[in-house]
Amino acid sequence: AAEEQTAVLEAKRMTSNNDFGMLNDYYTTYIGSRLERQQNRDASLSYSVSKEYDDLRILFEICRQKEIEPLFVHVPLHGRWSDYTGFAADRRAEYYENVRRIAEEYGIRTLDLTGYEYEEYFMCDTMHLGWKGWLAFDRAIIDYYYDL
């Protein structure tokens, strides 16, 4: 589609100083000169247990009590960056599954974008949606709105 073509052209222009497809400014400010130190820094990182899961449960419980029907957007991590920092795919999968399970427990409708970890230009930095990511989000929001 034309939107995707435009998104890719803009992304290429804005990510020209690094091999991770991240915004030039972000990469320069937060990673560039520290790149080598980032390699394998997350080798022991795990989200098997995290207090943030309880925070998510509280949010979903409030939604249930107030009869709010949210669309929970489950954003992926940046796959290539996570690999570089040593946050292994199996541990990311465990994290994704934990979040999915919590959403299912509360009957929360979810836009699961976690399958796009390696999609070029889906993320604009290590954790935020990028050009293709926002297109996927926009399409889902439109569908969600008209489906209510």
Regions found by a protein language model. Name each.
Residues 1-66:
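Secreted/periplasmic serine-hydrolase-like ester/acetyl group-modifying domain
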Residues 4-11, 15, 37-40, 44, ...:
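Generic alpha-helix detector with strongest preference for long hydrophobic helices that associate
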Residues 34-39, 74-77, 100:
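Generic detector of short, locally flexible boundary/turn motifs and exposed helical patches
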Residues 55-70, 101-109:
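A structural motif corresponding to the C-terminal end of an alpha-helix
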Residues 62-87:
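Active-site segments of SGNH/GDSL-like serine hydrolases
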Residues 82-148:
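Long, positively charged, glycine-interspersed low-complexity recognition regions
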